[in-house]
Amino acid sequence: MGMRTCWVLDHPAHVRLLAELLRNGNTSDLIIACDRPEVRAMLEQGDGKLPRRQTLWVPRAVGKGRYRKALYRVRSVKLFLNRANRDGQGLVERLVGVGAALEMLAAKPRWWRPSTVKERWYITDTEVNHKAHAIAKKSATHTVVPVHWRADLDGGFLASFRGVVKRLDGLHGHVHLVPHRRPTSVAFPPRVVVRSLRGGGVHDADELVPIPEEALLGLDITNADEDRYQGHPWDLDIELASHDGVITQSVTLASEAVLLGTPTLLVSKAERGFLDRLEREGAPLFRWRGAADTRDWEAVYAQFLSGLHLTDALDAASWPGAREQLTQWLCPPA
């Protein structure tokens, strides 16, 4: 029996990333879940995907009153962990989360207050999440970053982290996705998933670029906007693979779609190491950064539309062992 672990699920992509690890964990494990519609839907409809565990729901610390929400979140996590330590199922010895710096802070020992949480694992693939990095740098014992991490974007986080650093060879999507069979021909009109973001996140205020209205003309659209997706929350990857293309403001959805072989137009100013890696490896990713882009919108959009018909010419991308790596670190065989 391994460490009793508290898993932090802050974003729908994090739920998918950690689901198998949770299934391989202990029945006494705990979940801290961010109360956002997509995360709640995934937990409520997670039979067969995500085991039922004692769960604490916490607010998303963004927008108006974000500091009050953050303080409430830290206090709630402290109480949750303290109660769990007294429930007779063993001490909580490890906390694992993706970008979950506030939980690391809550579980960190102080000179006046010891902590049973000996290991605090901070997983991240988002170099620009500087506020979370600053907290994690002082609170986490381990960090997991990809081999394609761009230190020039991380505000000095990796260079100054004094804990254990693990380098993941692959994207987060390589951990939880399984390649699906793609359509053999392009529909007429092309079937395209479109995802817009609400904004208001910790680090996305300077990254959002509106999707031009003309991008949606003449397409058969499946709407997957943030917090408004009407399909089964666990089947979004199937939707991505079964469509001809994707247009999105979300870097996470873009990365998952192209790993599944679906041509994707990312409309965003965001810079990430994993986006650079996908481009180097020839993934069907088309990027438009808005008015600041050196290329015309019409040219990028035309390339995307042409790319919908060229997926047969793509070589199958290699699938690195990121899943096995993460499992070995967090759920090693007894």
Give residue spans per PLM region.
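Donor nucleotide-activated moiety binding/catalytic core segment of transferases
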Residues: 71-88, 223-255, 259
